[in-house]
Amino acid sequence: MKAMFLEIIRAEYVSGYTLKVTFNNGECRMFDFSDIIARYPVFAPLGETSRFKAFSITDTLEWDNGRIDIAPEYIYEHGKAA
């Protein structure tokens, strides 16, 4: 069986610092970025809600033209099934 690379195919803003993320395997995860924003200085700029909402999807979920990003695998493993 061929291994599937996990890719984000859609991400939707829910509220606060939570996104609903859909993967290429058909599964969805709710992921709250509150803890990451508070703990890791690189994510601190996302504490401004308008910046947090300005994400894009590439090979990762990213902000600020790739200056801030997070791997799909991390979201998948640490998010809650939606």
Residue ranges, per PLM feature:
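Motif-centric detector for short Cys/His coordination patterns
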Residues: 1-82
